[in-house]
Amino acid sequence: MLVFGTRPEAIKMCPLVNELKKRKELQTVVCVTGQHRRMLDMVLEAFDVTPDYDLSIMKDKQTLFDVTTNILNRIKEVLEKEKPDVVLVHGDTSTTFVTALACFYLQIPVGHVEAGLRTYNIYSPYPEEFNRQAVSIISKFNFAPTELSKQNLLKEGKDPDSIYVTGNTAIDALKTTVRESYTHPELEWAKGSRLIMITAHRRENLGEPMRHMFKAIRRVMDEHPDVKAIYPIHMNPVVREIADEFLGGDDRIHIIEPLDVLDFHNFLSRSYLILTDSGGIQEEAPSLGKPVLVMRDTTERPEGIAAGTLKLVGTEEETIYNEFSRLLSDKEEYEAMSKASNPYGDGHACERIADVLVRTL
């Protein structure tokens, strides 16, 4: 059984669903929590995945308390009915943590996809760092995307025989979504300009950090008339309010509704550079040859920084302004970042995970 509930999880788990369904030795059941609703459904449709169970927990202004209690109350019935041999969860969301906790209560083995990412600061990112550390205590199968993730798990005392380095399933997803023939009206609008993709939504960046981020972006945009930006905005009303205040009203910055995964990956592949506080984009962009400025104070993906394709710029206005300006003005710096190696795998992570399950279950 696979359980997931948010758009980022779905992007990385749907390719695994489809790979597992090819394996006749396995019976695959999919349960979604609906922690994100509209954005989750867009991904399910893009990968042609139909859940067997949908807990539909999302409600307006839901808190971490709401998400946790609603999933815990509803997942119990599904797990008791299906009695799975293993439950696969992904990464670090509340869906992931609560599902793993429910499995622990019912003594059902857990497989953790994208295991071993760490900042070792449980409040950054919040609550994700706590979630993934807690799941690692529970999990029987640990599918680490990189060798560094494996080393983190070994340092924490995980059994070496429980850890499998697979690569990241995000790269598998890109193989099916990025298309040379793709077109979109927004990309036509940006043609002839350097296109900047913006994403920003992290809980710990809400408020002043996000204001600093957007002020820096607006300043740089004002100084570079050959640049256009597209920001597929998150559904969170707080994010929308801040974005409208600092980025609204500029005819070279298009704030648009969330894109489905096929659109989003193709926008990334046609961008000049990316400004983000997202985790998943830090993995996707290197395989597309796109420099990324990470607007966070910490990252659980240091492999991309070591490889040179990511740069951690924090949330201070002047730092973001300086680094964004440099990438637009310094061709050598840009070329070095765009040609850096991709540390996140070869697009065969799902096959490796499926192979492990066929061998061991």
Where are each of the predicted segments found?
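Nucleotide-activated sugar donor-binding and catalytic core shared by glycosyltransferases
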Residues: 1-231, 236-361
